[in-house]
């Protein structure tokens, strides 16, 4: 029997700003099944900070201050560890997502539609223009199949089923796994999402 094929991927980013064009420091992507909560491949990248700044991505002082006020463990996770060059990260994420489905026929999830996806779009816009000389938007996901976890959290909260946050580490992998759990709990309990 072959490896299970997943049709859903959760992504999460940790950044040094709240607007597109800000530095994306780390990204996680996790395949999952909303019905069962089962996860598949997981991948985490820590993007080379110097690359991001050299290529014109910005650091917002308010976000930098916010990171300085987080726990020592969260700050350490944010700063330490092997870094992936920016172009290698974009190629790797593209490969990860194309392994889900080469025709982009999968659902991409994130916590807020106006945060993670626009942050990554700005990186892909830079990449398409500077690495490929292409000013068209070429993304490794289908923009029609991007979903937001926030309404699922609202449905859980309304039903009194929203689990307490179990960590304050602010790592993209921990956030992805928590967000997958929210989606699964909504499916498991047949809650209405608005």
Predicted features and spans:
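Basic/polar N-terminal segments that are highly enriched at the extreme N-terminus
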Residues: 1-4, 194
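Acidic active-site catalytic centers that drive phospho-/nucleotidyl reactions
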Residues: 12-14, 116, 148, 175
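Acidic, Mg2+-coordinating catalytic module of metal-dependent nucleases/exonucleases
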Residues: 107-113, 118-119, 158-194
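Conserved non-catalytic scaffold segment of RNase H-like nuclease domains
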Residues: 3-9, 14-110
């Amino acid at each position: 029997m072959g490896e299970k094929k997943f049709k859903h991927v959760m992504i999460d980013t940790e950044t040094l700003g709240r607007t597109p064009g800000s530095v994306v420091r780390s990204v996680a992507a996790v395949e999952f099944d909303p019905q069962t909560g089962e996860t598949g491949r997981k991948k985490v990248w820590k993007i080379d900070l110097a690359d991001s700044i050299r290529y014109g991505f910005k650091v917002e002082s308010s976000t930098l201050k916010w990171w300085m006020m987080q726990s020592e463990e969260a700050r350490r996770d944010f700063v330490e560890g092997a870094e992936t060059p920016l172009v290698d990260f974009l190629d790797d994420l593209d490969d990860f997502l194309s392994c889900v489905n080469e025709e982009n026929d999968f659902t991409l999830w994130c916590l807020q539609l106006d945060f993670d996806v626009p942050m990554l779009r700005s990186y892909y816009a830079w990449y398409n223009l500077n690495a490929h000389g292409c000013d068209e938007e070429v993304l490794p996901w289908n923009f029609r199949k991007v979903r937001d976890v926030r309404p699922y959290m609202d449905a859980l909260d309304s039903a009194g089923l929203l689990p307490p946050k179990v960590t304050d580490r602010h790592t993209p992998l921990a956030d992805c796994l928590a967000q997958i759990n929210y989606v699964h709990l909504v499916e498991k309990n047949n809650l209405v999402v608005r």
